[in-house]
Amino acid sequence: MAQASDVHEWISFEDPTEDRTWLIDATYMRSSHRCIYGEGCKGVLDADATEMQQGCCSYGAHFVDDDDVQTVVRAFVNVKPHQMQFHAEATREGFLEPGEPDDEGAPTTVTRQVDDACIFLNRPGFDGGTGCALHIAAMAAGERPLDWKPNVCWQVPIRLEHETDGTGHVTSQLREWKRRDWGDGGS
C-alpha cells in the first residue's frame, strides 16, 4: 500500500510543437522542498551520510550525452588547481571513465571517483572550498555554474526523464529524485 508521502498529483499535456507528452509532478513542484549542498543533506548512500558532506556526489556524475561531456571538458580547462582538490589527479589520469551501459546497452560516460566520490567534489577542509570544484570555479569566473556542470548536477533535485515509444512519441516526465533512483547505493 502506498504511503501518503508517495501519493502525488500529476499534470499532463501534449506539446503542440512536437510529438511529446509532458508529465509533471505537481505535488513536488508546489512543495517547499529544498536541496542545497552543505545544508544538512543526508546524501544518497544507504545510511545517513550527512557528516561526509558528499550530497549527491557519492557516485560521480552520469552524463546524458556527448554534449554534456563536452560542457565539462571545456569547463575543466578553466578550473585552477587551487579551486579543485584533485586537480593533479584529473590532469594526470583524466576525470572521465566509462559507466555502466544504459537501458539499451549503449555505452555511457561518468566522472571518475576519488575516495568514493566524484573527482570534482572538494572534501571538507580543502582550502579552495568544500563542494563542487566546477561550481566554485564558475562562480569565481563570474559565470553560471549550470554552464560548467554536468546536467544532472544542476538539475538535482529535479529529475527529467524521456521515454520514446515504438511510434516515436516521447513522454517527458519531470519529478523529484527519489533515493531509489540512485541505484544500489540510494535504496
Positions of PLM-derived features:
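Short loop/turn segments that flank or connect secondary-structure elements
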Residues: M1-S187
